[in-house]
Amino acid sequence: KFENRNPRGTLPAYSLLAGRYTIGACIAVDGEGVTYQAIDVTNAHRVVIKEYVPVTMCAARTREGAVVPRAGKEVLFKTTRMDFVDLYRSLVTLGRTEGLVTVLDLVETNNTAYAVREPDEGETLQAYLDAREEPLTQEEALMLLRPVVYGVEAMHRMGLLHRGISPETVFITKTGSAKLSGYATLGLRTADSELKSQMFDGYAAPEQYAVAEFDGKYTDIYGLGALFYRVLTGKTPVPANLRRMNDTLPPAHTVDKEI
């Protein structure tokens, strides 16, 4: 049961998307758009839906729910929407994969696109670590995060990059398994891009702080390395943009000689 109190400019609760998904509460807003709880009426399963409606490019919505780009932003909206569609279409093709939150469907309607995925289960890795009194051992870290590494590897084989690996985008399920969520297009994970960016300082790679630089598999490898640094040392890594100017990040083995 949902409360019909979604913010103005978002889809109203109980509206039906593509004849299949009942929109529920708005649960998050970022530079790419709006995320909703929802129900797949074909099987009564709960899902999460992300609507591509970037605040920097979209000004309004018609009475029928169609997204209206800002004047002068029409072409940019269309091209970045294509990035969103390409990403999530590939993730739908990838299907259920160890260590990844599953993307179930991609819907194109209302002059925009909607990514449908399974809900995030359990708690974030950040909450999990905060509840511990000490860092993980190397054995614990490998056992916990190995599925995430496999998931990132599967994305790379598809030609996809995650760009947002962090304790906030890894979820620990009730069974103790780790899953990576937080998929996003290049613009959301690059500073000073055409979108209002969402960066994870300490985990974002150096090239994510400059629109003129290229990312690659190494971007996610940096994020994984930073993630392991955090779980093994208990310390948040120094942001990459600051490390470029003056690298004050102590090597992990100097924080803990057992590493």
Language-model segments: which ranges?
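Activation segment signature within eukaryotic-like protein kinase domains
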Residues: 144-145
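C-terminal lobe helix-coil module of Hanks-type protein kinase domains
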Residues: 202-259
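AlphaC helix of the protein kinase catalytic domain
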Residues: 125-136
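Conserved short submotifs of the Hanks-type protein kinase catalytic core
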Residues: 110-124
